[in-house]
A protein has these predicted regions:
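Short, structured surface patches at the beginning of a domain
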Residues: 1-145
């Protein structure tokens, strides 16, 4: 049997920012949810780029059923809508469970005890994650102006 892992993804845009600042919070959340052994990926790279070395490594190494744990959607993506859809496709293709620390419905979904609750939370999460990804992209565009 393959043991499930939690792949913590930490990203900051510049070397001046501390990508690891949220590590303890994410490790604590992982432990509280009992998700599995942690593997940490730290990246200082723009969230507007789909092709990121550590994110690619994470997706390459991930196994079906592993958890991808991020602090917030904007740490995962500031991508265009098309690129974000591609990233979501890759995450789903690998069979990763996306858990977002500041989006409690993502971890409520994995704790759901019945299929109806799970399905409802999955729909809510998909909508919220898409909305938050769009807001992260718009926020990035405003900063550039």
């Amino acid at each position: 049997m393959i043991e499930m892992n939690t792949r913590i993804y930490l990203r900051a845009s510049t070397k001046d920012q501390d990508a690891k600042r949220a590590l303890q919070i994410l490790q604590d959340l992982n432990q509280n949810l009992n998700l599995g052994e942690t593997i940490v990926y730290v990246e200082n790279y723009s969230g507007t780029k789909l092709d990121r070395p550590e994110l690619n490594k994470l997706l390459s190494e991930a196994n079906q059923g592993d958890t991808l744990l991020v602090e917030s959607i904007d740490r995962l993506s500031r991508l265009t809508q098309r690129d974000f859809q591609e990233l979501k496709r890759r995450i789903q293709e690998k069979g990763l469970r996306l858990v977002v620390a500041d989006l409690p419905t993502t971890y409520q979904m994995i704790q759901a005890s019945d299929s109806i609750t799970h399905s409802i939370l999955e729909l809510i999460n998909n909508m919220l994650i898409d909305l938050l990804a769009t807001m992260a992209r718009l926020d990035n565009e405003k900063r550039i102006e």
